[in-house]
């Protein structure tokens, strides 16, 4: 018989009754019934009930003193449970093991929190003792799910003709939109590697090298703050790139992958390909966001023209100054109490708005609310038609500059969806956001900057760049860039790449980069483009966010085995940590006086 186990703890069935077996695992629960002691023995696979009887008093006394989470090996005989003790919640619930021997392989110290239920524990303690936290059923299953998702992704990509690559982790800094993690070079004093924010340049170089379809489960590193759906420091993405493709080719490739993935690992309704396509400007108008949650049926409408000649002075004057007026439809909200409308106004103010106004259309057709007296009957009818409002509904209004109004209305839309319980349940709704602006105006520098990915192909190519002369014309340029969104969460960004050196030089010059700077920062790419680059494009759905959605986790740390906390610290490994002076000298690093004082205090060196 094997030293530790003949079966795992999720394996024994009625067909095993009478067999001598050996099991190993953790003490999950212990119940002392006087003449019987029951131990729920848990391993990676499941739970088996072990029974100790007073026929072996010494062994039963031994079992009654076992600490939770101690590792034990038990030998015994499989017996059928009596009719009244069957546990249908367990796969092994029809049997139990009558113990004849028990060996403690490793005793557990007192636990910092309970393992055998999902009772909330302090996050600091959970992260500091992550090896214990990972034993808890929900988190344990999340990590298994993550592994299964990644394995299935690999299968789906390989059967579609993609080749898996590994690209360098130590590379050079590039403007991907976040701060780099820098690694000092010992051999080249004063120089630094950067951990890749994405394998962007390498995957494009692979296309130029003649590989047709690339993919990688790619680690990415960005020095940015944590959010519920964003881990600080490190994340993983399904990175892919394809040669000789259009935007539609990318869509047609990734949509079936996501549909297959989500239908395999969930019972919820999943959007079928082709997914809805929404141009960026339309998304910002209708949803107030470039990552709309389509489970929410509320649509935002532009009603600027209705108020341009209205009697409401505030909106009329705002419009003269270039502001817009937006209407947010609130279905079946007309009969709600005044406190509901006051709550929505308070919410808008908390989000930076001056206020929020509204009109109520009762079931009988009566019009009420602060703005109702400022609109004519005809204007009210146009408003109802424009905002798709019926009797029994309410409409909220916001007025501001276009971008500010869009963002505010987007937040109000989300809040209304929650307050009115409008979100469609048990579904994953996908959409594409397309035609992103190529450039944006940087308020801090007062200059034109890239809106998203600087390596995207501008729609219209070199002609569009050369014909756009004014700031307004430049900001109107769009890129072959697209995001995929699911239930209001951005899963991925992608683009058709700029593969022509002359277009890249021109695009960067508009953003304030000289040809010399472009050559210095992207020398490998520019050189490669001059030796025959195929048209190519790609996308990179986030693995962490996909698993987060499938696991129905509210925080991304719940689907990562060893995550950092909100302050980008690893409490388990005590990272980041101070290093000794010798290591700093080897790397030619000198700390500032303030940092040196802190370093000395914490290291004693």
Swiss-Prot record:
It is an enzyme of class 6 (ligase). ATP binds at residues 222-224, 490, 542-545. Keywords: Aminoacyl-tRNA synthetase, ATP-binding, Cytoplasm, Ligase, Nucleotide-binding, Protein biosynthesis. It catalyses: tRNA(Asx) + L-aspartate + ATP = L-aspartyl-tRNA(Asx) + AMP + diphosphate. One of its GO terms (molecular function) is aspartate-tRNA(Asn) ligase activity. The record marks 33, 84 as: Important for tRNA non-discrimination. Its EC number is 6.1.1.23. One of its GO terms (cellular component) is cytoplasm. GO terms for biological process: aspartyl-tRNA aminoacylation. It is found in: Cytoplasm. Residues 200-203 are annotated as: Aspartate. CDD domains: AspRS_core (cd00777), EcAspRS_like_N (cd04317). Its main location: cytoplasm. It holds the Pfam family tRNA-synt_2. L-aspartate binds at residues 176, 222, 452, 497. SUPFAM superfamilies: Class II aaRS and biotin synthetases, GAD domain-like, Nucleic acid-binding proteins. It comes from the Bacteria. Belongs to the class-II aminoacyl-tRNA synthetase family. Type 1 subfamily. Aspartyl-tRNA synthetase with relaxed tRNA specificity since it is able to aspartylate not only its cognate tRNA(Asp) but also tRNA(Asn). Reaction proceeds in two steps: L-aspartate is first activated by ATP to form Asp-AMP and then transferred to the acceptor end of tRNA(Asp/Asn). Homodimer. This is Aspartate--tRNA(Asp/Asn) ligase. It comes from Rickettsia typhi (strain ATCC VR-144 / Wilmington). The lineage of its organism: Bacteria, Pseudomonadati, Pseudomonadota, Alphaproteobacteria, Rickettsiales.
């Amino acid at each position: 018989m094997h030293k530790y186990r003949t079966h795992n703890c999720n394996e024994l069935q009625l067909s095993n009754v009478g067999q001598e077996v050996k099991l190993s695992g953790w003490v999950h629960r212990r119940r002392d019934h006087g003449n019987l002691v029951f131990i729920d023995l848990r391993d990676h696979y499941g739970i088996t009930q072990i029974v100790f009887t007073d026929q072996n008093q010494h062994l039963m006394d031994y079992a009654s003193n076992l600490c939770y989470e101690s590792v034990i090996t038990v030998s015994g005989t499989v017996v059928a449970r009596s009719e009244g003790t069957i546990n249908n919640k367990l796969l092994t619930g029809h049997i139990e093991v009558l113990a004849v021997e028990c060996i403690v392989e490793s005793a557990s110290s007192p636990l910092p929190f309970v393992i055998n239920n999902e009772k909330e524990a302090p996050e600091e303690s959970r992260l500091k003792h992550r090896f214990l936290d990972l034993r808890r059923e929900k988190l344990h299953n999340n990590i298994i799910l993550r592994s299964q998702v990644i394995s299935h992704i690999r299968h789906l990509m390989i059967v579609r003709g993609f080749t898996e690559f590994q690209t360098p982790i130590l590379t050079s800094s590039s403007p991907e939109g976040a701060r780099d993690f820098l690694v000092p070079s010992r051999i080249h004093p004063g120089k630094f590697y950067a951990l890749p924010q994405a394998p962007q340049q390498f995957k494009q170089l692979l296309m130029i090298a003649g590989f047709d379809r690339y993919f990688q489960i790619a680690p990415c590193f960005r020095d940015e703050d944590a959010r519920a759906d964003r881990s600080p420091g490190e994340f993983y993405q399904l990175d892919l790139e394809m040669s000789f493709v259009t935007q539609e080719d990318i869509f047609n490739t990734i949509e079936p992958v996501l549909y297959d993935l989500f239908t395999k690992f969930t019972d919820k309704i999943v959007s079928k390909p082709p997914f809805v396509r929404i141009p960026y400007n339309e998304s910002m108008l209708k949803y107030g966001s470039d990552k709309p949650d389509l489970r929410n049926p509320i649509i935002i409408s532009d009603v600027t023209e209705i108020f341009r000649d209205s009697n409401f002075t505030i909106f009329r004057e705002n419009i003269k100054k270039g502001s817009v007026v937006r209407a947010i439809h609130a279905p079946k909200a007309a009969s709600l109490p005044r406190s509901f409308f006051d709550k929505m106004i308070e919410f808008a103010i908390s989000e930076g708005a001056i206020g929020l106004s509204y009109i109520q259309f009762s079931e009988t057709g009566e019009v009420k609310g602060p703005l109702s007296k400022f609109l004519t009957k005809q204007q009210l009818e146009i408003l109802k038609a424009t905002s798709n409002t019926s009797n029994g509904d309410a409409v909220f209004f916001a007025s501001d500059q276009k971008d500010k109004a869009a963002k505010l209305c987007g937040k109000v839309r989300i809040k209304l969806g929650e307050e009115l319980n409008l979100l469609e349940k048990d579904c994953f709704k996908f959409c594409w956001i397309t035609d992103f602006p190529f450039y944006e105006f940087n308020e801090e520098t007062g200059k034109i900057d890239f809106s998203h990915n600087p390596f995207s192909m501008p729609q219209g190519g070199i002609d569009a760049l050369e014909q756009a002369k004014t700031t307004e014309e430049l900001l109107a340029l769009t890129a072959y860039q697209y995001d995929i969104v699911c239930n209001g969460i951005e899963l991925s960004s992608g683009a058709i790449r700029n593969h022509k050196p002359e277009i890249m030089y021109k695009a960067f010059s508009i953003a304030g980069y000289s040809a010399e700077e472009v050559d210095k920062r992207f020398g490998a790419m520019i050189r490669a483009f001059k030796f025959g680059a195929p048209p190519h494009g790609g996308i990179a759905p986030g693995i962490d966010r996909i698993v987060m959605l499938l696991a129905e986790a509210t925080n991304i740390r719940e689907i990562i085995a060893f995550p950092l906390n909100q302050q980008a610290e690893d409490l388990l490994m005590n990272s980041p940590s101070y290093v000794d002076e010798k290591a700093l000298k080897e790397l030619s690093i000198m700390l500032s006086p303030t940092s040196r004082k802190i370093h000395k205090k914490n290291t004693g060196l």
